[in-house]
């Protein structure tokens, strides 16, 4: 399995301001996930890491502000464990169906646009 990043399209830049299209073709749901300060999603339960896994949707996570570290686990991949330090310039991280995933932010937090 090869990880994919969907590129963003910067259509205008002025001093201190960037305008870009954050859309991902073929998606039908969008949510904004804000981490205020150091946060983990989903949070640990009784000291044990928790993970999301979707059986019927592909997530596309685009950092809007800050940075987010994603842990991806998928036993079907040749390399089943990946840690991605995601920033906006990388584009939207595609998380395939059946992939266990979680994310953390540093002390300053982050904002991510998730399109599925």
Role assignments for model-derived ranges:
Residues 1-88, 107-116:
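Active-site region of the double-stranded beta-helix
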Residues 90-103:
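Histidine-centered metal-chelating micro-motifs
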